[in-house]
């Protein structure tokens, strides 16, 4: 029987006795002993001890050599062999990727690690600790958890296994809608404290901040509170009742006016504290909690007050320089008959939201009717863009407490490059990659199958996931039957079309190319629908934000296939289905171009436009919002809101490959400027936490979406 040796990297080679004898002879030479017969005898003895074995690990062979040498007459050779093996192991480890990445973090020299996430400040110790844990977790998962073909596909850039620094090493999931109402209403335990139902809005928001921090430390994606205005409205009423009681006790003449004034002040202060709390917290993941607040549908006096408080606080800014807050991400719901048009009861709140968006870029908007049409029911996205599908429990629609288990993204441009212009080859390759992506996604599900509730009490025992399970229960059941989603992502539709059909025609300008692009996403959707039917899990199609991936996929493809005009030449791939950032079109045409995609990729999407300063032209901004209402479910507006604290300039800083600079005075000191950019679905501060090279280049190339050079 031929013996196969399994090497450290998993490769398999035929057993060769001469390699053993050569190593022993080198050890003998090192201690100046000449006895070739002895060396051959030891090698032969080791070979005989392994006879009949089909497979043997390289370490087992080396251990056998050491044992034979230690039992033999030349102890010096044994010592020399052991020292030689140790030195080789050390040298090998120093050359290994794990050690190289750890060194790159410690020495702050590996920008791919330092700038991978724009929400993580890699200069500070807590973040460095998280990044170190992530390096180790990623290394272990690749070697010991994931199938080899999945790992190789990830390494080559055929697919991307998102968040490998957390999952599958840890039994964590991606993003979620917190069941805040259930937690505040029924109480819960956090650490050593039993938390009862709050008796005021200030207490409710303080507790909410602690819930956000705890939840964000147990998951790796975004944390969303759906309809926060409606959830917290009862606690505003509780505050009003307390203030009214004080007015009665002190015999204040206009008790109602007093109670209203005190309640408005308390509500504003409560949400100011919540905003500061979110932006000063550091989770166990080494970052500010990536949290989203959905609001806008509440009609009560209390809910309206919360809506105003959220928007007014955001406009006020943070600190003495009134800096734009990056978190929470604000998502404002617009509904016809409620706040959409003049005369609607909450139209005044929409006007406040428009003002806020012009000054602070947030809120993004959710168009109620389109969200229901595309996703089956109304809900705020989890994180920046992940949407849940329809799920009923006890005959009622359920949103809160649900989550996404994770994402695997396809590199569509690479498939197109490999197809070499052959559409049939493209579709064949795509189907093969889809099978691989499904296999990778199933590993995420498998990792959670035998996990006990006790690993994350805040999620599974105290109500964040909408359940109150026991410590030794399994978590797997709450992810089945579509209660949780699990997503196939994709990137670079624009570059895919260019790779397949050339750059003579732009996809925006050619109806045939548009149809071909849509057909690709239609095929992805068919695959996820099929997987859902086969497994019972909530597979969905997700338009990947690609903050880091836009750089990584393009970099790998350029190294493999060279610089291809219109594909790998820019240094980044375009975000999901979005229009090429360099294409000069008006915002209405851009909306129409992107509108077909959210209904297909209804597990995750966002559309947005680039605009000039609109603070003095809110009507123009409202026109775009209104145009989007019947066309896309989810829309964001990017406007220039940069500030220089040296010369007082406000507007748009100059963007170069090296960073951002004040166009008036040249200031680029992160401590003396505020630069805010949409990273993908959320905002970032690239002045203090730089983007990766690909994302920086993409931001640099963005053009304004204007009608005939102007808007409005």
Question: What is each PLM-predicted segment?
Answer:
Residues 1-108, 696-703:
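Charged, amphipathic alpha-helical regulatory modules used
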Residues 3, 46-50, 291-292, 495-500, ...:
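Short, hydrophobic beta-strand segments
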Residues 91, 98-482, 503, 510-669, ...:
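Conserved catalytic cores of very large enzyme subunits
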Residues 230, 486-499, 522, 678:
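Contiguous, well-ordered alpha-helical segments that form the cores/surfaces of helical PPI scaffolds
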């Amino acid at each position: 029987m031929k013996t196969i040796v399994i090497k450290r990297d998993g490769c398999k080679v035929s057993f060769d006795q001469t390699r053993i004898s050569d190593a022993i002879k080198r050890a003998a030479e090192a201690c100046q002993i000449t006895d070739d017969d002895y060396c051959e005898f030891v090698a032969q003895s080791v070979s005989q001890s392994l006879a009949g074995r089909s497979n043997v690990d390289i370490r087992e062979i080396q251990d056998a050599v050491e044992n034979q040498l230690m039992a033999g007459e030349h102890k010096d050779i044994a010592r020399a062999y052991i020292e030689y093996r140790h030195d080789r192991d050390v040298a090998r480890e120093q050359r290994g990727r794990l050690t190289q990445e750890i060194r790159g973090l410690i020495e702050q020299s590996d920008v791919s690690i330092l700038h991978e996430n724009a929400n993580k400040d890699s200069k500070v110790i807590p973040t460095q600790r998280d990044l170190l844990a992530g390096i180790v977790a990623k290394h272990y998962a690749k070697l010991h958890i994931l199938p080899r073909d999945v790992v190789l596909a990830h390494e080559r850039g055929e697919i991307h296994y998102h968040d490998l620094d957390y999952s599958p090493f840890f039994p964590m999931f991606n993003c979620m809608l917190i069941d805040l109402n259930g937690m505040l209403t029924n109480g819960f335990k956090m650490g050593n404290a039993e938390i009862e139902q709050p008796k005021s809005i200030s207490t409710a928001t303080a507790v909410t901040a602690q819930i956000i921090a705890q939840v964000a430390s147990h998951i790796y994606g975004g944390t969303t509170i759906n309809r926060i205005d409606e959830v917290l409205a009862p606690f505003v009423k509780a505050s009003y009742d307390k203030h009214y009681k004080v007015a009665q006790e002190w015999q204040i003449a206009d008790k109602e006016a007093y109670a209203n004034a005190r309640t408005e002040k308390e509500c504003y202060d409560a949400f100011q504290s919540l905003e500061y709390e979110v932006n000063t917290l550091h989770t166990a993941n080494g970052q500010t909690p990536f949290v989203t607040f959905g609001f806008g549908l509440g009609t009560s006096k209390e809910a309206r007050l919360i809506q105003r408080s959220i928007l007014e606080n955001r406009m006020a800014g943070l600190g003495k320089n009134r800096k734009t807050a990056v978190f929470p991400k604000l998502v404002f719901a617009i509904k016809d008959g409620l706040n959409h048009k003049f005369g609607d009861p909450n139209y005044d709140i929409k006007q406040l939201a428009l003002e806020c968006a012009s000054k602070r870029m947030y809120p993004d908007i959710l168009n109620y009717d389109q969200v229901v049409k595309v996703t089956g029911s109304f809900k705020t996205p989890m994180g920046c863009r992940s949407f849940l599908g329809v799920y009923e429990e006890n005959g009622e629609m359920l949103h809160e407490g649900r989550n996404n288990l994770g994402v695997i993204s396809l590199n569509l441009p690479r498939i197109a490059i490999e197809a070499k212009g052959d559409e049939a080859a493209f579709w064949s390759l795509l189907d093969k990659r889809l099978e691989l992506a499904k296999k990778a996604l199933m590993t995420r599900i498998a990792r959670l199958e035998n996990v006990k509730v006790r690993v994350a009490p805040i999620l599974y025992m105290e109500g964040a996931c909408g359940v109150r399970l026991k410590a030794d229960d399994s978590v797997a059941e709450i992810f089945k039957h579509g209660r949780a989603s699990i997503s196939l992502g994709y990137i670079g539709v624009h570059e895919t079309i260019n790779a397949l059909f050339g750059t003579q025609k732009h996809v925006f300008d050619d109806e045939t190319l548009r149809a071909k692009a849509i057909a690709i996403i239609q095929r992805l959707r068919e695959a996820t629908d099929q997987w859902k039917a086969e497994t019972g899990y909530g597979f969905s199609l997700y338009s990947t934000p690609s903050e880091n991936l836009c750089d990584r996929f393009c970099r790998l493809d350029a190294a493999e296939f060279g610089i291809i005009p219109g594909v790998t030449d820019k240094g980044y791939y375009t975000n999901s289905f979005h229009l090429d950032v360099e294409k000069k079109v008006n915002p209405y045409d851009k909306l129409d171009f992107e509108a077909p995609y959210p209904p297909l990729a209804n597990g995750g999407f966002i559309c947005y436009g680039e605009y000039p300063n609109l603070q003095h032209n809110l009507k123009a901004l409202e026109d775009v919002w209104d145009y989007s209402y019947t066309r896309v479910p989810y829309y964001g507006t990017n406007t220039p809101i940069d500030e220089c604290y040296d010369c007082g300039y406000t507007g748009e800083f100059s963007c170069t490959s090296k960073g951002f600079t004040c166009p008036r005075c040249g200031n680029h000191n992160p401590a003396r400027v505020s630069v805010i950019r949409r990273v993908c679905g959320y905002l970032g501060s690239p002045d203090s936490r730089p983007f990766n090279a690909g994302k920086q280049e993409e931001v640099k190339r963005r053009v304004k979406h204007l009608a005939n050079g102007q808007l409005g």
